[in-house]
Structures are given as structure tokens and as C-alpha cells.
Amino acid sequence: MRKKRLLSRISFSSLFLLCGTLLSACTGIQADLRNLIKETTGKDIDLSKAIKTKEGKKNIIASLKKSYEVNPRDTTKLLLDAWKQSFEEGKLGIPDFDLTM
């Protein structure tokens, strides 16, 4: 049972890391993320600078986790929008999928 909990925590953190990295490339979503983090944590993070450092990435992930605890619906929507945009632009490193319709 503990292995399952640990695995889900690791998977959850990996999802936030992936989405946090993807958000750095999406300027429209970047503004939404900045506002969401500011509303839920009170921190005003410069994402373009924070995403370039290991400590900055940790801060973004921690802020996203806190934001998810406070406002799961908006946080999830933002992360899924960022993932979708990055996927459509081919920034996920999965070139074999073509989702354009």
C-alpha cells in the first residue's frame, strides 16, 4: 500500500514538472499561470526566469501543488490547456502523432 502511495506522489510530481516546463513556452498560458499562482499562494513569480533554474522549477512545482490544493479545477484546466497547446505545437518530443484535424 505504501508503494502505491509513493508511486502516485512521484507520478503527480512528474506531471507537475512536465507541465511546468511546458508552460514556459506558452505565453498566453504563462500569464494565466502567473495569475493563478499569485491568487492562490500570494507569490508573484517571473516564470521566464524561474523555469531556467533548478530552484525556480522547484518553486513553480511547489506553487502548482499549493494552487491545486486551493483551486483544483482551475489548476487542472490550466495544466491541461498547456499540455494540449504544447502537444499541438510538437513540443513534447512525440513527432509521430498528428492531432491536427
From Swiss-Prot:
A lipid is attached at residue 26 (S-diacylglycerol cysteine). It is a lipid-anchor. Keywords: Cell membrane, Lipoprotein, Membrane, Palmitate, Signal. It is found in: Cell membrane. A lipid is attached at residue 26 (N-palmitoyl cysteine). The keyword Lipoprotein applies. One of its GO terms (cellular component) is plasma membrane. Its main location: membrane. Residues 1-25 form the signal peptide. It holds the Pfam family Lipoprotein_3. InterPro entries: Lipoprotein_3 (IPR001595). The keyword Amino-acid biosynthesis does not apply. Belongs to the MG439/MG440 family. This is Uncharacterized lipoprotein MPN_467. The lineage of its organism: Bacteria, Bacillati, Mycoplasmatota, Mycoplasmoidales, Mycoplasmoidaceae.
